[in-house]
A protein has these predicted regions:
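Motif-centric detector for short Cys/His coordination patterns
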Residues: 1-125
Length: 125
């Protein structure tokens, strides 16, 4: 695990840029960070207690707050602010983005939910 050399919210507030000293750079969408928040309201209090997040397509990053020397608190415009993203967790999210994003899309599809806040998914037979 390494500490990023740069963490910036892009101007549109829908993405977090993370850079490391080895030259690696990652752009993590706000929606992705929100649905994979380490906060208890998302992760629950143990394995199998997760709450599937949906309707977060338009979520933005309102602000960042450093949590000691080991983590970042991300505040989202939907009011969510309880997730403390350790540098290690952010690196895991970045390195496994494709796999985690595909899994999330499959989970909301299987649950009949939408990434859009006001959408209602109707299954046709």
């Amino acid at each position: 695990m390494s500490t990023p050399t740069k963490v910036v919210v892009v101007e549109s507030k829908d993405c977090l840029l993370i850079a490391y000293s080895d030259g690696q750079e990652y752009n993590l969408p706000a929606e992705f960070l929100r649905v994979y928040s380490p906060g208890a309201e998302v992760r629950g209090h143990g394995e199998g207690n997760e709450t599937l997040q949906f309707g977060k397509r338009e979520v933005k990053i309102s602000s960042l707050k450093q949590a000691g020397n080991y983590a970042l608190q991300i505040v989202f415009n939907d009011g969510h602010d309880s997730g403390i993203y350790s540098w290690e967790y952010l690196q895991q999210l970045a390195e496994n983005y494709d796999e985690k994003w595909a899994r999330y899309l499959e989970e909301i599809h299987n649950a009949g939910l939408s990434r859009d806040q006001d959408a209602q998914v109707i299954k046709l037979m």
